[in-house]
Every structure is written in structure tokens, then in C-alpha cells.
């Protein structure tokens, strides 16, 4: 009934998109799965604002996480240190001390948050996931499970405390994981540039996710991308990778200078007076994330999917380096297997098309025979 009310209301107001908030209300309060809401909306020639729905869903998840934390302990100060330094742009390890810590009770388990005097661990932000790794002294090792920024301070999540909190530690980022993340992040910048170059400067970033496995990029565009456009975009990104452009990084430069350089800024994002600029060839963006030192380090780039997430917003997911190589290798293996089945024709596509044509012709003959048999059976029955 609530869905019917929403559909009628949207049509009455001459709107063609159901807000993500309303879709989330159906999901959260009435137990309506999103795909069912999308199906009913589609039947009524309506769309769903998926970006807003995802935002509502994430907010609920964050509230659930907060609710699951039954109690935060008070911050226990070990060392007075008003300024925490992030050294992760230049280093993946550092000698550190713990300045503060506190406990938190999550889903029946006690975990801990640590703050260091300085840190090589990148905190989640700008679409990039937080670093993991470990801290170690002569009494043992503690795994860093995640890194986030809270109230401007970088906080490290651990399942247990070191035996000696006052020790000096060696902090080490999971470098293999970070390298994979950096490849995907730099590829995201090249993808953004390729989209604006091929589709037009109306393209604006609307969201992103960068982790060690893949990259996801949401952007404004008015229509589904056709296979030719996707191929051009993929080629453009791979060409930029092969140009082997060295990273040009400028830190703490005035915003006005960044604007003059033509740096891309995210709509709605709040920037300070000083910003960090990341450049690979003609790709210039404001960014606080971790990147490769040269575009060639990204390896191959392969688009895995393109879809709509709301009216006027498209989403591309892609793979880099070894994961992209695996996809390409699998496709080639499939090609070889099909070619082998068809006795290695010189023109595989033509052979498949001929096979389809022959199959359709045989199907018509079979249908005709079945019809003839059926008619003959009817005649026999009538004689009887």
C-alpha cells in the first residue's frame, strides 16, 4: 500500500525519480527489498535514486556500529603530544610511540583505539580504504586492523593492546596491500580524465571506492555507455598508463594556484586554503590519497562493469595489474576453447554467426516437422 502511495504521489507531482530516502523507508520500515522497489518503479516508468539510497543505508550501518559499541572508555594519555604527524606519503614504516589509547566494546568484544605521535598509516578517506599493518617491539607484535580519522586525529584499530604501552614501536604498513590500493587509486584519476576527454567535461565525480581488489567510480552522465565508448575509455586509460608519466605531487599549495593549474575539484567537497595536487600527464586533481610513483606501475586496466545507480549517475568498476591480466587471460582461454570447438576457423566471429544462422534454420525445419506430425495425428484421430 505504501508503495502504491509513493507511485501515485510521484506521478501526481510529475516526477520520474523516487528519492533514495523513500526507497530506504520501504526497505527499512516495510521490509521491501531494493530490487523489488526498482522492479515496481520500472513498471511505472520511474527510477530510484540509488546514490541517496546507499547514503541512507550507510548512515544506518554507521548508526548500527555506534549502537553496537556499548561503551567507549575514556582516552588514557600516555604522552602529551598536541600535534600528530602523518608521514605516510614518504614512508611505509616509522618509529612510533603511543600517546593515547582507549577501549571500546563492540559486539560483546573489547577492542582498542590507538593514537601515535606520528604515523605512516593512511586513514580512510577520499574513497580510499584505510591502511592495515602492525606495530612491533621486543615483546611482540600487534596487528593494525584499520585506520580512520576521527575529529582530525588518525586513529588505529587493534584487537589487543601491546604488553608495554610505553615502549617504542616499529610501525609497518602492509606494503603489498598498499601498493595494490595505490595502483587502483591512480587508475581512478586516469579514468576520470579519460571520461571527461571522451564523454565531455560535463562528467563530474559523484563517488568512488578504492581498495586492494578493485576500483569503483561514480560519475554524472546522461546515458548508458555503449561498447564503443567503453572500449575507447579503456584504451585511453591504458595509453595514459603506457605513457609512463611520473607522479608530480605538490603539497600545501594555495588553492588559487591549484585552480590556475586546472586541477579538478570535487563538487560539494570542502577544501582548506592549502591543498595537495596530484598530476599524471594531463590528469590533474586535488587528492589526499596514496599513489604510484609512475603511471606505468599500474599495469593493465580493464573495465569489469558499467551500470546506472540513479538518474544521470553512472558507475564503472574496473581492475588493474594482475587482476586485469587474469580477466584478459580467462577471456583468451575462452576464445581458444570456442575456436577449438569450431575447428579453428580463420574468422571466429563469422563462424559463430554462421552457426547461429544454421541453428535457426534447423529450428524452423524442426518446428515445421513437429507441426506436420501434429496435423497428421489430428487427421488420424478424426478418421478413428
Which functions belong to the PLM regions below?
Residues 379:
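Residues immediately C-terminal
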Residues 1-374, 382-384:
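A glycine- and charged-residue-rich anion-binding loop/surface
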Amino acid at each position: 500500500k505504501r508503495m502504491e502511495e509513493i507511485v501515485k504521489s510521484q506521478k501526481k507531482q510529475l516526477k520520474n525519480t523516487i528519492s533514495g530516502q523513500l526507497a530506504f523507508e520501504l526497505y527499512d520500515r516495510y521490509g521491501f527489498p531494493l530490487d523489488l522497489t526498482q522492479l515496481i518503479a520500472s513498471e511505472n516508468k520511474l527510477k530510484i535514486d540509488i546514490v541517496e539510497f546507499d547514503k541512507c543505508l550507510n548512515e544506518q550501518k554507521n548508526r548500527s556500529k555506534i549502537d553496537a559499541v556499548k561503551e567507549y572508555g575514556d582516552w588514557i594519555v600516555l604522552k602529551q603530544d598536541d600535534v600528530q604527524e602523518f608521514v605516510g606519503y614518504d614512508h611505509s614504516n616509522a618509529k612510533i610511540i603511543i600517546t593515547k589509547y582507549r577501549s571500546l566494546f563492540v559486539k560483546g568484544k573489547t577492542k582498542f583505539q590507538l593514537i601515535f605521535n606520528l604515523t605512516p598509516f593512511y586513514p580512510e578517506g577520499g574513497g580510499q580504504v584505510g591502511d592495515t599493518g602492525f606495530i612491533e617491539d621486543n615483546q611482540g607484535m600487534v596487528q593494525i586492523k584499520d585506520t580512520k580519522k576521527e575529529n582530525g586525529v588518525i586513529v588505529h584499530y587493534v584487537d589487543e593492546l601491546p604488553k608495554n604501552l610505553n615502549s617504542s614501536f616499529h610501525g609497518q604498513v602492509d606494503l603489498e596491500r598498499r601498493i595494490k590500493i595505490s595502483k587502483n587509486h591512480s587508475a581512478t584519476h586516469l579514468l576520470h580524465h579519460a571520461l571527461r576527454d571522451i564523454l565531455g567535461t560535463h562528467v563530474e565525480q559523484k563517488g568512488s571506492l578504492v581498495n586492494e581488489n578493485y576500483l569503483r567510480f561514480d560519475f554524472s552522465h546522461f546515458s548508458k555507455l555503449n561498447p564503443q565508448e567503453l572500449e575507447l575509455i579503456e584504451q585511453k586509460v591504458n595509453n595514459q598508463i603506457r605513457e609512463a608519466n611520473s607522479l608530480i605531487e605538490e603539497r600545501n599549495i594555495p588553492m588559487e594556484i591549484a585552480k590556475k593549474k586546472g586541477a579538478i575539484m570535487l563538487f560539494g567537497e570542502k577544501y582548506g586554503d592549502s591543498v595537495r595536487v596530484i598530476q599524471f600527464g594531463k590528469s590533474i586533481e586535488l587528492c589526499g590519497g596514496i599513489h604510484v610513483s609512475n603511471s606505468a606501475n599500474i599495469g593493465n586496466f580493464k573495465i569489469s562493469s558499467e551500470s546506472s545507480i540513479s538518474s544521470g549517475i553512472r558507475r564503472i568498476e574496473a581492475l588493474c595489474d594482475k587482476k586485469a591480466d587474469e580477466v584478459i587471460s580467462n577471456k583468451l582461454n575462452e576464445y581458444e576453447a570456442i575456436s577449438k570447438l569450431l575447428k579453428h576457423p580463420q574468422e571466429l566471429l563469422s563462424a559463430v554467426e554462421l552457426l547461429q544462422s544454421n541453428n535457426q534454420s534447423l529450428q524452423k525445419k524442426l518446428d515445421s516437422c513437429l507441426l506436420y506430425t501434429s496435423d497428421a495425428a489430428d487427421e488420424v484421430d478424426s478418421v478413428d
